């Protein structure tokens, strides 16, 4: 039993970072996960929630400050404030160091291997004005807002500093909104705007034009697209580099969305090659079919990966970019059964990537490359790109 109650304020020494963006502290040998703190600090922590084994809290007063602490650029980034950013009080360089620690820890604990990955920063290097997709809640007062951490409480805002400039200059922040339906805002690489509510465009264009590495994608606002304005280009570069694609290769693009990776790969494999895009989302599939309607070396499969992959034969390279919970054992086993010469895995969660990496290593695949990309500055989230090749029996 925990001897803490919600609302208690305790003084704690702040320990190491944990997966999920909290820092670990202890009170009478009981673990407390703390937000708004940094390793090495001493803080007064207000307990915000409790479960059977753990307590969670916010550092509401810093008694001993870390040299890595900075003033949060956003006025809403504070205990009890907006829950979107959890690293605004930490310098950019240290944010990346913490993300490296998180990746290393997950691979040590789950995959049982030691790694030393680079975590690279991405323009804009200030960590602000990078987010091209933003969902806004509506408060009881009819104002735009974002949710407090793990809460239904809406924190009213008139700007979001991690959002791109066009979102912040939009009129949506200055209007009164009726009802509870959320607003979804999107800005393309071509600076086109869409504001969507209840599935309908209420401001801007119905479709957005994205240009990535000389490939053009016309996408609907409900289709998945990377949030960081510069993420698509960087991810394409890393995936192409690690996959080592050649003319005539046969490739699978799993969880392929609208075809971010399919478009450049189709050019590299040429008419003698073939790429299979598998995606279950209706909006993404609709967009992908339009984008690639005249491409004979692209085959689109609408459905779950675990149902479609088994039917595709003679695949040499597999690219996968699954949701946060990863591909999982069933899909990874299907990938292994295909015996691809190389696998490139894009992941937004180090824990699920480490879990799936363990399965691949146990089945004769070698982890050759792993890099962290800081595509979510001011938050604990980090994108990873990993590549694997099948070990050759001697």
PLM-predicted stretches and their roles:
Residues 28, 51, 138-143, 149-151, ...:
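Short acidic-glycine loop/turn motifs at beta-strand connectors
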């Amino acid at each position: 039993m925990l001897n803490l109650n919600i609302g208690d304020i305790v003084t704690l020494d702040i320990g190491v970072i944990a997966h999920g963006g909290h820092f670990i502290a202890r009170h009478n040998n009981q673990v407390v996960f703390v937000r708004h703190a940094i390793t090495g600090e001493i803080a007064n922590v207000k307990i915000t929630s409790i479960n059977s084994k753990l307590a969670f809290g916010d550092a509401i007063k810093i008694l001993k400050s870390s040299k890595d602490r900075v003033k949060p650029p956003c006025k809403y980034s504070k205990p009890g404030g907006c829950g979107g950013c959890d690293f605004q009080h930490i310098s950019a360089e240290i944010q990346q160091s913490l993300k490296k620690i998180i990746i290393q820890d997950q691979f040590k604990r789950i995959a049982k291997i030691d790694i030393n990955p680079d975590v690279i920063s991405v323009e804009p290097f200030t960590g602000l004005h990078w987010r091209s997709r933003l969902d806004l809640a509506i408060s009881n007062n009819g104002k735009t807002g974002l949710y407090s951490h793990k809460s239904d409480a809406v924190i009213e805002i008139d700007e979001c500093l991690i959002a791109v400039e066009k979102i912040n200059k939009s009129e949506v922040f200055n209007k009164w909104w009726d009802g509870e339906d959320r607003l979804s805002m999107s800005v393309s690489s071509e600076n086109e705007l869409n504001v969507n509510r209840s599935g309908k465009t209420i401001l801007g264009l119905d479709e957005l034009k994205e240009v990535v590495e000389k490939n053009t994608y016309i996408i609907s606002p409900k289709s998945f697209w990377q949030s960081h304005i510069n993420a698509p280009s960087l991810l394409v570069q890393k995936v192409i580099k690690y996959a080592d694609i050649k003319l005539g290769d046969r490739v699978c693009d799993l969880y392929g969305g609208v075809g971010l990776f399919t478009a450049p790969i189709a050019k590299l494999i040429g008419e003698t090659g073939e790429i299979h895009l598998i995606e279950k989302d209706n909006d993404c599939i609709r967009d992908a079919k339009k984008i690639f309607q005249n491409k004979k070396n692209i085959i689109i499969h609408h459905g779950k990966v675990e149902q479609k992959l088994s039917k595709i034969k003679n695949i040499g390279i597999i690219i996968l970019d699954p949701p946060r919970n990863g591909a999982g054992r069933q899909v990874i086993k299907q990938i292994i059964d295909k015996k691809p010469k190389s696998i490139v895995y894009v992941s937004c969660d180090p824990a699920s990537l480490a879990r799936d990496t363990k399965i691949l290593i146990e089945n004769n695949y070698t982890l050759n490359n792993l890099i962290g990309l800081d595509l979510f500055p001011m938050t604990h989230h980090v994108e990873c790109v990993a590549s694997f090749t099948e070990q050759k029996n001697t």
